[in-house]
């Protein structure tokens, strides 16, 4: 059947298609539509005579020569008849068939005559194969007349052997119906009616030369891009490809916020608390020191010194619950960024600080400017704070704890728990420690407080150890975002890559897990190192 395949494939129209992962080939195949109105051929005219049909018995050996000559004449007549019939079908099929040259037509006719001429001969009305009578007027395949039941030469009837082509039994993968004559698609290892090959996204037929796939589902390229091509969470545009043709984007390691690399250099603001970038359709609140705060973080932000006092009392109770009560009264002040930086410069004990300082435990006498009262914020901008000077006097080893204003409650609390540990160790007479040990154990305490807060929030208890209330500090169960924010602050502590805060925390956490907090602190006080 290779020769037939060559003829049929000669009329294929190939459309090469593909997506960003694979190229898919679609074939539009055109086959002649069967004609039921073919005019009779010369052999048909002979068969329509009024003379009665005579059935001849098989010839003897003496008649072989004459019979061979007659058979050759018959074969030639059949070939011419099939050639004329093929030309009639080609003209009727119109747009569904591709023109072929005369040599190809003659080759097709000769091939068919060879098949017909070599078919077995039977007497009129005899049965063939499964008891089906093949004779004048019999239908063959798809209800089309095959050979027209014509009688050739001396009344002998030629019953053609059924020739089954796989293409006659094509099943559409879309509707599971048979694909008859005409145009069809071959793609995704299946055959389709053109109207059945549809986009999985919009359910409309795919008629373009290229398409995309996800799994075994086809998509228009535009539909695939809309569904699967990543969009920037900042500008809401499709993330562009780089010079190598690959989609390149940035993503926050915790929030998985995807954004174009260009936003890292185009002054797109970040929230100073959660570090998420500001989307184009969202307005962050700008504090008077230039920091930006997203609306979710603003919802629980601690804005002035008075508002922070209940939280301070709660953390004091947290330490007392660990048998680590801070005996002296240490002032807590919320300050702006400039005041915090100035106080850090005035501190002489040489503590290590991060580039963005958000808390400070002071041991020197100085005057700082504290946020006494918060101001209402206008549209997208903080109106300002009412500040007043505060004179720090040295009554003990610790003069004050300073915290940056405008941070969410959980972040403010974790910073306060960190600075409280500095104060506790100084008041307990700990020796001067290496930076990684001191900052590491302070980070352990901040992490422990966050753990306790999130656990208390899961039992619908907010600040379980504090009965005080304050404007802006809400009671009741935490919102889903606030719990997520608390997990983010824990993640920041755990994933810190700095050798002082990050490595120090991991070493201190391991020691506390192995020996307990009390024994770890005793070992630090005696040796200045974490127990191993």
Swiss-Prot record:
GO molecular function annotations of the record: metal ion binding; peptidase activity; ubiquitin binding
Outcome of mutating residue 418 to A: Abolishes peptidase activity
Effect of deleting the gene: No visible phenotype.
InterPro entries xrefs: DA1-like, DA1-like_dom, UIM_dom, Znf_LIM
Alphabetic keyword roster: Developmental protein, Isopeptide bond, LIM domain, Metal-binding, Repeat, Ubl conjugation, Zinc
Effect of residue 113 to G: Abolishes binding of ubiquitin
Chain positions of cross-link Glycyl lysine isopeptide (Lys-Gly) (interchain with G-Cter in ubiquitin): 95, 221, 348, 376, 381, 391, 474-475, 519
Phenotypic consequence of residue 422 to A: Abolishes peptidase activity
Biased composition (Polar residues): 57-68
Superkingdom in the source lineage: Eukaryota
Domain UIM: 69-88, 101-120
Record-annotated LIM zinc-binding domain positions: 170-230
An example Gene Ontology biological process: negative regulation of cell population proliferation
Post-translational modification: Ubiquitinated at Lys-95, Lys-221, Lys-348, Lys-376, Lys-381, Lys-391, Lys-474, Lys-475 and Lys-519 by the E3 ubiquitin-protein ligases BB and DA2.
Induction field: Induced by abscisic acid (ABA).
Annotated spans, Disordered: 26-71
Note: 'Da' means 'large' in Chinese. Plants overexpressing DA1 exhibit early senescence.
UniProt domain comment: The UIM domains bind molecules modified by monoubiquitin or ubiquitin chains and promote coupled monoubiquitination.
Quaternary structure note: Interacts with ubiquitin. Interacts (via C-terminus) with DA2. Interacts with BB. Interacts with UBP15. Interacts with TCP14 and TCP15.
Role of this protein: Ubiquitin receptor that limits final seed and organ size by restricting the period of cell proliferation. May act maternally to control seed mass. Acts synergistically with DA2 to regulate seed size. Functions synergistically with DA2 to restrict cell proliferation in the maternal integuments of ovules and developing seeds. Functions antagonistically in a common pathway with UBP15 to regulate seed size. Associates physically with UBP15 and modulates the stability of UBP15, which promote cell proliferation in the integuments of ovules and developing seeds.
Protein name: Protein DA1
Species this chain originates from: Arabidopsis thaliana
């Amino acid at each position: 059947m290779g020769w037939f395949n060559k003829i049929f494939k000669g009329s294929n129209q190939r459309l090469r298609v593909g997506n960003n992962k694979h190229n898919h080939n679609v074939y539009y195949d055109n086959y002649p539509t069967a004609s039921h109105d073919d005019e009779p051929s010369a052999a048909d005219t002979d068969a329509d005579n009024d003379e009665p049909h005579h059935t001849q018995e098989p010839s003897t050996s003496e008649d072989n020569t004459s019979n061979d000559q007659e058979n050759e004449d018959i074969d030639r007549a059949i070939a011419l008849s099939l050639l004329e019939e093929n030309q009639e079908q080609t003209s009727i099929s119109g747009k569904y068939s591709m023109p072929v040259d005369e040599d190809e037509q003659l080759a097709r006719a000769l091939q068919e005559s060879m098949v017909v001429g070599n078919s077995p001969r039977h007497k009129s009305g005899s049965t063939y194969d499964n008891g089906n009578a093949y004779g004048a007027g019999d239908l063959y395949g798809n209800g089309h007349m095959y050979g027209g039941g014509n009688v050739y030469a001396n009344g002998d009837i030629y019953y053609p052997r059924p020739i089954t082509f796989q293409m006659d039994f094509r099943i559409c993968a879309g509707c599971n119906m048979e694909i008859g004559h005409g145009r069809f698609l071959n793609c995704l290892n299946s055959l389709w009616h053109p109207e059945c090959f549809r986009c999985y996204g919009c359910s409309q037929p795919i008629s373009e030369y290229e398409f995309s796939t996800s799994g075994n589902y086809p998509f228009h390229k535009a539909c695939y891009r809309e569904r699967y091509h990543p969009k920037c969470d900042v500008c809401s545009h499709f993330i562009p490809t780089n010079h190598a043709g690959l989609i390149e984007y940035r993503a926050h390691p915790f929030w998985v916020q995807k954004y174009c690399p260009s936003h890292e250099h185009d002054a797109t603001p970040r929230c100073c608390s959660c570090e998420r970038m500001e989307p184009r359709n969202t307005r962050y609140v700008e504090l008077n020191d230039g920091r930006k705060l997203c609306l979710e973080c603003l919802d629980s932000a601690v804005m002035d010194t008075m508002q922070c006092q209940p939280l301070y009392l709660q953390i004091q109770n947290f330490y007392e619950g660990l048998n680590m009560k801070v005996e002296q009264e240490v002032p807590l002040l919320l300050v702006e960024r400039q005041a915090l930086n100035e106080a850090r410069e005035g501190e002489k004990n040489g503590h290590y600080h991060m580039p963005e300082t958000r808390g400070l435990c002071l041991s020197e006498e100085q005057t700082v400017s504290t946020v006494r009262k918060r101001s209402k914020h206008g549209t997208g901008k903080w109106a300002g704070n009412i500040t007043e000077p505060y004179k720090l006097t040295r009554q003990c080893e610790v003069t004050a704890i300073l915290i940056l204003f405008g941070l969410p409650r959980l972040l403010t609390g974790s910073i306060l728990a960190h600075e409280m540990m500095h104060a506790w160790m100084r008041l307990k007479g700990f020796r001067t420690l290496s930076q990684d040990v001191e900052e590491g154990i302070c980070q352990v305490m901040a992490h422990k407080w966050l753990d306790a807060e999130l656990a208390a929030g899961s039992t619908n208890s907010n600040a379980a150890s504090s009965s005080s209330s304050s404007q802006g500090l809400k009671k009741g169960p935490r919102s889903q975002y606030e719990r997520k924010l608390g997990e983010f602050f824990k993640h920041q502590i755990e994933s810190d890559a700095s050798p002082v805060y990050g490595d120090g925390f991991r070493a201190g956490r391991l020691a506390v897990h192995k020996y307990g907090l009390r024994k770890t602190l005793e070992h630090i006080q005696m040796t200045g190192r974490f127990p191993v």
